[in-house]
Amino acid sequence: MNCLYVFNPENDMALADGKASYTPPARIRQMRQELWWLPEWWADEGDIVWNGEDKLNLPDETRILPWGWSTALCRQLRQAGVQESLLPSAEKLEHIRQLSHRQTAVALLQELREQLPLDGHFCGESTLCRSEEEVRDAVGRYGEAMLKQPWSSSGRGIRKIQAKTLSNSLVKGASSKEQGEVSLIVEKFLHKVSDFALEFWLDGKGGVEYRGLSLFYTNERGAYLGNWVAPEGQKLAWLAQYVPLSYLQEIRRWWEQRLRSFDYEGPVGIDMMLAEEGICPCIEVNWRWTMGLVACLLAEQGRYGRMVVEYIYGHYAAEVEAFG
């Protein structure tokens, strides 16, 4: 079965908007236009990588693998000529949208910490707030916190705040509205040592495949900068400087078991953090492709180095730089 790959980096913003007519900001449109070819790094012979413009005439058995699913992408594919039988239903799209809401990560972090205490080495707390009063209460408990919108990624829709500087206007500006009420995640601020993630693939029938460990780095605003593309053993050895590997194995086993219960087919990336306070085993749950998964696929090809996606001289570029 051949695949159609689509790099649509605006996916999280399209989920936040929720409408089929969504148009992303100009900078994100530029990223998609200039990096549409990215799936060529892992596509097999006979697969198609869509540039977002060409008309499509796909065989009925084609498997469509976008960066992420949204009603906006489905509309684009229909306009390109893709038959309805190859697209997810409206119900499935809404299910993916709700899974992608940060409330999923909030609930799973609490569940994991209750079931897998790891001798007190875990850290991280987050609260889903449905009113401005709940936001103020949560920030007051944490003292220093991150405000996060329900659907956002790579530093967008995220703001650091201290209890003493929290104002009504700031809460209103940071919040999104769902059915007329405030929706905002308040996350206790952690002093980061390193970002990492576990990458999985779910088959939609209870099967969970572990695809690898992702070591990635971001700027001070949380925007993605790049990944370390290396053998799994090297990545584990680096993390072992900071945390016992037995802890990582327990965390991985917990996620493998927990993910079996979700009605979902496709990639899942669990963003985590090594912090001065301990290990946070769930910062975000990405129900889509991630650069971490791409790095794992490149490592399987033996293309080791530093994978970077950057905006330079007014254009986007992606490459794997050899280790110096």
Q: Model features per residue range: what roles?
A:
Residues 28-140:
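Conserved N-proximal alpha/beta basic substrate-recognition cap immediately N-terminal to
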Residues 30, 166, 210-234, 288-290, ...:
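Extended active-site and interfacial segments that coordinate phosphate-rich ligands
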Residues 1-40:
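N-terminal-proximal low-complexity accessory segments that begin disordered
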Residues 222-277, 316-324:
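A long amphipathic alpha-helix within ATP-dependent nucleotide-binding catalytic cores
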